[in-house]
Amino acid sequence: VLLGRALLILGLLAALVGVAAAVRAHQTDDTRLLQVTRRLVLAVTSLALLAMLLLEVAYVRDDFSYALVAGNSSATTPLYYKLTAVWSTQAGSLLLWLCVLSVMSAFVVRGAAVAHRHLEPIVLGVLLTVCAFFLFLMVTYASPFEASPQGTTVGAGLQPLLRYPLMALHPIALYIGYAGATVPFAFAVAALVTGRLGSSWLVAVRRYAMVAWAFLAAGLVLGSRWSYAELGWGGFWGWDPVENAALLPWLTATAFIHSSVIQERRGMLKVWNVSLVAATFVLSLVGTFLVRSGILDSIHAFGASTLGVPFLVLIAVVMGASVWLIAWRRPLLRSDHRLDGLLSREMVFLLNNVLLVGLAFVVFWGTFFPLISEAVTGTKSALGPPWFEIYTAPLGIGLVLLLAVGPSLAWRATAWRLWMRTLRVPVALGLAVGAVGIAAGVRTPSTVVVVLGAFVVLATSAQELWRAARARSATSGARLPSAAAAVVSRNRRRFGGYLTHVGFVVMLAGVAVAGASSSGKDVTMRPGDSVSVAGYRVHYERPVAEVRSEKITFGARLGVWENGRRLTTLSPAREYYPSLDSSKGTFGRFFDGEATSEIGIRASLGRDLWVAASPDLQTLRSPIDEANRRFATVPPTAQALIIAAIAERYVVRAPAVTFRVIVRSGVSWIWIGAGLMGAGAALALRRPRRGRFLPGRRRQVVSR
């Protein structure tokens, strides 16, 4: 515990000295001070990683002298969850934030030392300032190295809802996204301070922005999957305040990635780009603040704490400094060119940004409306999912339509007839698919438009690849597949973007179809009973009970039939974790602690069958009370036998179970679309190959 505190204090001192050295290095252009700053960045990184390693070792060794370990782990917690439990707590998540940011800062040291020497002092100074902020919080407000009360030998265990494999990765992905947004912000501040506001800083942050964007997207998708497979309500996005807070920086980062292309190519939107970078960083801080402040109710929040005030101060300082710097450098942020034509790729990018920022505003307003309404009227009123869906759906449809037409437009200006000729095949395909959807029973106009648009995007992207490959084949003599591979290899950013767009619209189409085609019911059944939902027959075959050291599971074995044919077997269950409340009795605490749902899902490309079970344990109340009275003092081995006997009674007596059965189309396409987005981002992040041989009629070097 003392060693961990010492590491944090040393890290804070190193960060503060590094900030001072960075400022002085900028003022004097002293390379020795800059070298000191670089070394201090690496020192902060090393100290942060050592602190994380120390905490991980404490979890693995069940060292309950650490309050964090005692409160969030136990001897029976599986190793995987011990390793990931570190960031399930407020203090541990701050340490994770610091580790991710410091590692990224070390990468900046490695890259900026050669390519961006003039920006480096301010960049490192900003990064170290943010590191110092998180170190200050851990030293003064929420230390991960607090000691447990004397004599603590038993841990409380990990919060049951977090015992889901993907949920352990969800915070890491989000924090890489949040911390990744700090790097573009640091470069933007450096560009504003130094007055070097060309495209060089954009080139420097391009990969960091893409990494942050990709991991924010991954975090959002992992959280959605957890909600769908674990929470027991049947949905994948509930417009929860903390979910929305993670979505906000992703939207502004998406806008920046697109608008930065215009500045690189045409020298336009300079004010807009630095504003988007600042907004993305501020919204990342807002997301981190919201989960810790307790000001809005959320299943994801840590609860009320004193950390809200420091975060509000930092957010206010960042916003004020950003506005002042942009206003100060406004003369240097004038665009080099004007928009040449409305029918151009620049115009599509601009409209894309307007819609993305509009979406961010709608989500921000809806998320913080309880606070706004309380401030104005004195009454806290929340806006539910229907409100969000009403106002976000038109903007989402607009994005799909822009993605459908964007690739077919040229930079600066496009002839109307040429554009129409280019869009003929994609639009015809989209209309045909829309007609098929209507014939299949899809009646929601927005769903038809999104699905139609998704196919137009797919067809437009495929057409762009085919045209580029055909041109390459004609000049090189290579076969078309080889030429296509060469084109993609040399233009990974472009075609990675196309693949990401395809994944995005596929995901949106899945969301639209899932929202328009859900049907289900709640039904109470006993073994032998059946229920029919949307063509499926779900038959309750028998109850299931399982006793493990860390939980007791009560569930059901269900047979799923369609058109007289057995499709699969599902085993939805409810898992009960022991309570530490001794007032519930020696045995009662095992059956009356926190419970989570294990969902039975039969997934397919067409539709999902989703089943949750809620067993009635009232029939076990009598044997539990009797065991509490008669066997409260028996040894642990005897307790285990009695608990197993009580659980077996559930199987023998087979009480009624309430099932929630939902059939929803399109859900699998959400995860497929997310996978395509990830593949597109990975392709765009890979550096293009140069000077490679193309297979064909003769070996030929691809010219630069």
Residues covered by each model-derived region:
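Solvent-exposed, non-transmembrane regions of integral membrane proteins
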Residues: V1-R704
